[in-house]
């Protein structure tokens, strides 16, 4: 059995948070050198003050009494706001909580370990429990006796049931591989055949007297994937039926059903439904299967020949469980459609030249859909819309000058709106469902912010490398900012396709405390940033490491006209995809970037998993030019600035082989660089104090020279 690695970051996007926000903890050691460096005292003085500088006007109000009132807390005191009288009254304090609640099976309500699945699943009526053990599926009945549902799962034959391959958990968000029917009469489960998949051997426990090895069937770009099947077990007959989950032979790349995921039952338990794609992931079929016979039908099909399809679109059932709302990018922008379960399109609910961004509520009694969309003054400002379930009378209900987050009342008569922009802090308001203002409930208090002399974050625009796509950046200034001086710049990055970014939604935040070291912090977007439509994302298809880096380079160039920016002192940092972006920016643009800290980066996409990599790059055999252009090793001879590399020795996501090949290439090219290693650490980032030492040393105390543009 493979040894599971603990202590890993729970999700890829979590690794991007420090990079996106630019917030670091105070020094926790690092030989205390940071204490002696320029800016340290100012940072220590301002760090906590900045993070508490604004009393937010976001009440985080909760609807009660079916929409007649709101409850919220201000300064530790609870209040009830009466919608009819428009008056607030203080409520008694809640009694202190004692003890913790009982956790449920299979993780106590938490997520399974990264890339893994829950090992148990209890039937809805709580009579039975299906569980994964020793590569087989077991069933425990009401008498407590366990019997095997499968028996041929084995490590020797590389067959397993009731669990999934690592790549399915990591890239397709499969946190379970066992699915009970709502009526508790049947249970569906995965079967994985990993025989064709090469193993990766990861050395663990390297700080101990003797190390151990974790063996994982890990398919890398271009190599065979595991073969997946789904079976349905009938509790009464104790027999399993194999579903016809694919259109052809499992090893054929063109077969739709190469990947099978997002498995669930219809509400009436009449069919098991799932999504399936071809290996290239430019065709996705929403599929329904009869659990008694295993026969399957395609409910609807999505194709996007110039890129990849969204592999898990929004799907919301209506109350009759026969109609559902479906999100599709088929027009080039994400829109909503109403279907019946036979696959018949009833109507397009929206047809916008901008992205829909989430369903708030389906009000069938009123015959309307409330949803969010990127229809503000720019794509980063989400708005509340209402449209009839017949696709008519679409209306925006919020002010397009702001970004909105809304909570609709249970009775559908009002909604709470939290409105903000990058330079206007949150205000909470009560509006009726026509969008008419009823009352302003709270405004942010900026008194402390102003007393501290803090500067609001500035938004700027620049053109992408194509010369026409409008992109946005955010600039964070130190409280001591003097426009007559020149400042070094730090650029926190993530940069992956459609990944989380603070330039994807325009919200208010205080300046990054890191600025107090004497830096200006700049966040950049690219055509990989979500929210601009599918055709914009198409620009990066088969070109990871090229287009998004070119766009960020244009953002750095756009700052050159500002006299207080020192273009010879620009640093970039990030983790995971952000680590890849950091290394590539330094290597590809030595005339723009003087220093980079790259944590846990992919360095060549041939070394990463099939599902993620091939979605954007296809296979190396048919896109050699793209893989070569996206490899950090291609550019090592261009290294001029300072490079800090970090990796965890127990990283089972982005394997240490990525870093080893980059280090080897740098050494062969005669290049100098620094390394930091996380012994027995998984997919993680560098010690933040050490990273700040690196940037202060190389951009302030002895700045690396670059040829300015």
Where are the language model's segments positioned?
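A conserved hydrophobic secondary-structure block that centers on an alpha-helix together
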Residues: 109-156, 250-253, 262
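A short helix->beta-strand "capping" segment at the edge of beta-propeller domains
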Residues: 33-58, 108-110, 238-246
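Serine-hydrolase catalytic core recognition
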Residues: 198-199, 260-261, 269, 275, ...
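Surface-exposed acidic, glycine/proline-enriched linker/cap segments
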Residues: 154-178, 206-224, 308-321, 451-460, ...
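Bacterial N-terminal signal peptides that target proteins for export
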Residues: 2-15
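Bacterial N-terminal signal peptides
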Residues: 12-25
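Non-catalytic accessory segments flanking enzyme active sites
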Residues: 58-62, 67-69, 73-78, 88-111, ...
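Short loop/turn segments that connect beta-strands within beta-propeller blades
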Residues: 83-86, 141-144, 235-238, 290-294, ...
């Amino acid at each position: 059995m493979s040894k599971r690695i603990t202590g890993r970051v729970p999700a890829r996007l979590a690794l991007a948070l420090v990079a996106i926000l630019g917030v670091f903890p105070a020094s926790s050691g690092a030989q205390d050198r940071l204490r002696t460096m320029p800016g340290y005292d100012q940072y220590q003085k301002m760090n906590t003050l900045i993070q508490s500088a604004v009393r937010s006007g976001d009440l985080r109000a909760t609807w009660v009494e079916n929409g007649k009132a709101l409850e919220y807390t201000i300064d530790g005191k609870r209040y009830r706001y009466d919608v009819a009288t428009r008056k607030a009254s203080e409520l008694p304090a809640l009694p202190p909580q004692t003890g913790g609640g009982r956790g449920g099976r299979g993780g106590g309500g938490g997520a399974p370990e990264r890339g893994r699945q829950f090992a148990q699943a209890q039937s809805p009526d709580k009579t039975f429990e299906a569980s994964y053990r020793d590569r087989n599926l077991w069933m425990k009945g009401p008498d407590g006796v366990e019997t095997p549902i499968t028996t041929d799962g084995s490590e020797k034959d590389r067959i397993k049931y009731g669990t999934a391959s690592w790549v399915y958990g990591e890239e397709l968000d499969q946190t379970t591989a066992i699915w009970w029917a709502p009526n508790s009469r049947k249970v569906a489960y995965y079967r994985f055949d990993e025989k064709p998949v090469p193993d990766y051997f990861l050395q663990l426990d390297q700080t101990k007297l003797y190390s151990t090895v974790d063996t994982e069937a890990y398919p890398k770009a271009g190599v065979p994937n595991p073969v997946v099947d789904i079976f349905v077990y009938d509790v009464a007959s104790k027999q399993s039926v194999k579903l016809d989950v694919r259109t052809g032979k499992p090893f054929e790349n063109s077969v739709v059903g190469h990947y099978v995921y997002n498995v669930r039952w219809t509400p009436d338990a009449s069919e098991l439904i799932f999504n399936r794609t071809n290996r290239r992931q430019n065709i996705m079929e929403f599929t329904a299967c009869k659990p008694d016979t295993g026969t399957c039908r395609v409910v609807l099909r999505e194709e996007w020949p110039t890129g990849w399809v969204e592999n898990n679109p929004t799907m919301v059932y209506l109350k009759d469980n026969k109609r559902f709302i479906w999100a599709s990018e088929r027009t080039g922008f994400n829109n909503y459609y109403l279907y019946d379960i036979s696959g018949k399109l009833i109507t397009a609910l929206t047809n916008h030249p901008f992205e829909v961004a989430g369903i708030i509520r389906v009000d069938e009694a009123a015959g309307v859909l409330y949803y969010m969309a990127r229809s503000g003054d720019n794509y980063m400002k989400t708005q509340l819309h209402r449209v009839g379930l017949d696709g008519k009378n679409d209306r925006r209900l919020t002010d397009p000058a702001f970004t909105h987050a809304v909570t609709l009342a249970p009775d559908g008569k009002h909604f709470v709106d939290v409105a903000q922009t990058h330079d206007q802090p949150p205000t909470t308001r009560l509006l009726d469902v026509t969008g008419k203002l009823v009352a302003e409930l709270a405004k942010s208090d900026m008194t402390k912010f102003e007393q501290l002399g803090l500067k609001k974050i500035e938004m700027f625009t620049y053109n992408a490398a194509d010369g026409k796509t409008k992109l946005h950046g955010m600039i964070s200034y130190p409280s001591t900012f003097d426009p007559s001086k020149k400042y070094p710049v730090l650029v926190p990055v993530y940069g992956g396709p459609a990944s989380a970014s603070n330039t994807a939604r325009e919200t208010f935040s205080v300046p990054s405390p890191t600025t107090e070291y004497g830096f200006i912090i700049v966040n950049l977007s690219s055509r990989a940033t979500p929210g601009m439509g599918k055709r914009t994302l198409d620009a990066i298809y088969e070109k990871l490491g090229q287009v998004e880096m070119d766009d960020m380079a244009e953002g750095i160039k756009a700052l050159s006209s500002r006299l207080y920016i020192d273009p010879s002192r620009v640093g970039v940092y990030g983790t995971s995809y952000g680590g890849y972006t950091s290394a590539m920016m330094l290597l590809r643009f030595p005339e723009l970037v003087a220093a980079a800290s790259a944590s846990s980066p992919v360095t060549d996409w041939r070394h990463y998993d099939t599902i993620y990599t091939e979605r954007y790059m296809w296979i190396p055999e048919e896109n050699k030019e793209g893989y070569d252009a996206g490899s950090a090793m291609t550019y090592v001879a261009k290294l001029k600035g300072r490079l800090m590399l970090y990796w965890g020795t127990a990283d089972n996501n982005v394997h240490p082989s990525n870093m080893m090949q980059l280090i080897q290439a740098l050494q062969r090219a005669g290049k100098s660089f620094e390394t930091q290693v996380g012994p027995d650490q998984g997919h993680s980032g560098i010690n933040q104090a050490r990273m700040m030492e690196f940037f202060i040393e190389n951009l302030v105390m002895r700045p690396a020279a670059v040829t300015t543009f």
